[in-house]
Amino acid sequence: EVDAIVKGAINTFHPKEERFMVMSLGSGSACAIFNEGDILHAGGTGLGGGTIRGLSKLIIGEDDPKIINSLSSKGKKEKVDLLLKDVISGPIGNLPESASAVNFGKIDYSDCNKEDLAAGIISMVGQTILKTAITIASINDIKKVYVIGRSYKYDLLREMLIDGFRVINIEPLFHENGEYAICVGTI
């Protein structure tokens, strides 16, 4: 599967670099590195789109990705998460005061709705994916990240990836057909 991830990204994006990372965001998440022809599985997490769907079904009674995306786009994670500004009154290092300090730490069902809960779910999953990917990219001195799979189609998750990678001066690249990249990579 790791070869299919990288080969699919190469066939989808046609990168010019000899060294880059591919993030495959499916049911779980995987990071693979391409380095001058060599392919390495660099890590990942069991959190991904499957986690978003499972938690959404459990917490808000929805498991359709389009509905979850629509709900989360209207939600406010700050209604369910304690933010840095709530806990220590400001930013820490390069983390803004709006970063989550405690996922679901402010839950008050009288003050949040399905939209807020959906945003909190995607935020929690996205933070773990992002921290994993940033660590891998930093350790391996990666300058380009190509994102494939279907889970980046969640608007909030995609925004989190863009903002998070910006902190380490990397712009993640997405492709409208990125969800088919692994299939292309198996051919």
Where are the model-predicted features located?
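Glycine-rich phosphate-binding/hydrolytic loop that grips phosphoryl groups
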Residues: D3-T12, I52-K57, D64, I170-I187
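A glycine- and small-aliphatic-rich helix-loop capping segment at beta-alpha/alpha-beta transitions
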Residues: F13-E17, N35-L40, I60-E62, L161-I168
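Short, high-confidence coil segments that cap the C-terminus of an alpha-helix
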Residues: E17-E18, I142
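Short glycine-aspartate micro-motif
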Residues: R19-S24, G44
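Short beta-strand scaffold segments in enzyme catalytic cores
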Residues: G28-F34
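Glycine-rich phosphate-binding loop plus the immediately following alpha-helix
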Residues: D38-S89
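Adenine-nucleotide phosphate-binding core of ATP-dependent small-molecule kinases
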Residues: G93-K144
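Glycine-rich phosphate-binding loops at beta-strand->alpha-helix junctions
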Residues: I134-S138, I142-G164, G178-E179
